[in-house]
Amino acid sequence: MNIHEYQGKAILRSYGVSVPNGKVAFTVEEAVEAAKELGTDVCVVKAQIHAGGRGKAGGVKVAKNLEEVRTYAENILGSTLVTHQTGPEGKEVKRLLIEEGCDIKKEYYVGLVLDRATSQVVLMASEEGGTEIEEVAEKTPEKIFKEYIDPAVGLQGFQARRIAFHINIPKELVGQAVKFMMGLYRVFIEKDCSIAEINPLVTTGDGKVMALDAKLNFDSNALYRHKDILELRDLDEEDPKEIEASKYDLNYIPLDGNIGCMVNGAGLAMATMDIIKHYHGDPANFLDVGGGATAEKVTEAFKIILSDKNVKGIFVNIFGGIMKCDVIAEGVVEATKQVGLELPLVVRLEGTNVELGKKILNESGLNIVAAESMADGAQKIVSLVG
């Protein structure tokens, strides 16, 4: 789960991590009032959306007086920002962060992520702050430094100091930088983050180390023990289809293609998308109905797939292990009748009760194309979609 920058900074502040003072605003008047309350010579007006690249898209402006705050707030609120992370449709700005300006001396990058290859949290840092870390990794990977953290003992002071020296934090500010990184690590672990990224971390003219931006993502599987984090969820920033899917424990991710996929199991779902691409088709989604799907869940899955107007055909690919093929077949038949499906539908069933499942499909009287294998199904749906 993602949250906004201002929410992430509030969490960091509660852990003693240094961030600039700021206030959230939902209207132009609130933005002006927030700037008055901050009482600083310079304010930064920042669009709050769940995407990076806001500055390049015109979503971050420096205001030197209240009139500029008003002008920028009027221009940004309600506008649609298009960045490399939003897709071509962009995201509408519905809230702003009004923040005190900083006398920036130098920008750095600091982030914590889980390295699945080593099963350890890794602290990454670079003195190339303010730019996309992926770009740094591609062009100058030698400028990224890493410390792998033993989960039994956590981040150690010497590791944080080593990182601070590697990225050339001024010696007199190393102590602050170490405290900053230790606090960030506590947030990452105690709040079950999947990413804790500060880009940029800055040193200021008055000798401070602070987070100028903050990106915190959380492991959705751990949200049951973080009710406070769950309350920060902004449904306006999420795809309505994903929200609807989550109500039925369906894992749905929209893509840009025109072939809807309904599969059980994440691995099979990825393999299904791969084989559709192999036969020159384009999947419209990743949709995993899970191991315990019912006819109701299958029906809802169909409705979610069909809510995407780009979908021109559907490929159902089920391997019945825990899941029984007859249950899926009943769900497919019921869903097809309920939604009045007119698009091409290819179904491949294999596993538990497969013959019974095929019988249900064959006797349904519906225009369902049967596939004998995953490759056969992919070829058929690609051909039908054209």
From Swiss-Prot:
Cofactor comment: Binds 1 Mg(2+) ion per subunit.
Catalytic reaction(s) noted: succinate + ATP + CoA = succinyl-CoA + ADP + phosphate; GTP + succinate + CoA = succinyl-CoA + GDP + phosphate
Binding site for Mg(2+): N199, D213
Name this protein carries in UniProt: Succinate--CoA ligase [ADP-forming] subunit beta
Entry EC number(s): 6.2.1.5
Family annotation (InterPro entries): ATP-grasp (IPR011761), ATP-grasp_succ-CoA_synth-type (IPR013650), ATP_grasp_subdomain_1 (IPR013815), SUCC_ACL_C (IPR005811), Succ_CoA_ligase-like_bsu (IPR005809), Succinyl-CoA_synth-like (IPR016102)
Keyword entries, A-Z: ATP-binding, Ligase, Magnesium, Metal-binding, Nucleotide-binding, Tricarboxylic acid cycle
Binding positions (substrate): N264, G321, I322, M323
Lineage top rank: taxon: Bacteria
Domain ATP-grasp, first and last residues per copy: 9-244
GO cellular component: cytosol; succinate-CoA ligase complex
Necessary cofactors: Mg(2+)
GO molecular function: ATP binding; magnesium ion binding; succinate-CoA ligase (ADP-forming) activity; succinate-CoA ligase (GDP-forming) activity
Family recorded in the similarity comment: Belongs to the succinate/malate CoA ligase beta subunit family.
Organism in which the protein naturally occurs: Bacillus cytotoxicus (strain DSM 22905 / CIP 110041 / 391-98 / NVH 391-98)
UniProt cross-references to Pfam families, sorted A to Z: ATP-grasp_2, Ligase_CoA
UniProt-annotated binding residues for ATP: K46, G53, R54, G55, E99, C102, E107
NCBIfam families to which the protein is assigned, alphabetical: PRK00696.1 (NF001913), sucCoAbeta (TIGR01016)
Metabolic or biological pathway: Carbohydrate metabolism; tricarboxylic acid cycle; succinate from succinyl-CoA (ligase route): step 1/1
